């Protein structure tokens, strides 16, 4: 995708947009599984819901494939896409604990370690995976195994 085609996207979002012409592109497209070597047209570092909405609209209007990256841990590389748009949610990582309701509110880009730290302060434990850099969005949708996972059949 030409840089001029991305101008509408960079103007529509507050977060940073990294494309193939940027010096940090290879680092920005890297995933947890180093064997995955996908080359998205651009990576959008969303800073809020408005960025997510604008990036999705941009991709839809142009017929671009879309991938959402929280932690980038999916073994098959589903957090990236060749020639499409990657929405990186890592800046949307707020974790709020309501101890009286025994409830946690987590934004899509939060990592498991951030959730563990926030809940631990209130004496809570999260039955989730054990790799602290795993994105909670992917963990929620794809699952994971951790110390508090149910055992047996």
Identify the function of each model-found stretch.
Residues 1-151:
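N-terminal accessory segments
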């Amino acid at each position: 995708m030409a840089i001029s085609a991305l101008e509408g996207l960079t103007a529509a979002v507050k977060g940073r947009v990294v494309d193939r012409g940027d010096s940090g592109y290879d680092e920005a497209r890297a995933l947890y599984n180093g064997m995955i070597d996908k080359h998205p047209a651009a990576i959008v570092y969303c800073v809020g819901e408005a960025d997510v909405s604008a990036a999705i609209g941009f991709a839809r209007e142009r017929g671009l494939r879309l991938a959402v990256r929280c932690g980038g841990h999916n073994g098959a590389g589903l957090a990236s896409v060749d020639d499409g748009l990657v929405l990186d949610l890592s800046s949307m990582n707020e974790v709020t604990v309501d101890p009286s309701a025994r409830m946690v509110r987590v934004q899509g880009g939060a990592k498991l370690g951030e959730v563990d730290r926030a809940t631990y302060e209130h004496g809570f434990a999260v039955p989730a995976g054990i790799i602290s850099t795993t994105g909670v969005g992917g963990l929620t949708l794809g699952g994971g195994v951790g110390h508090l996972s149910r055992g047996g059949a």
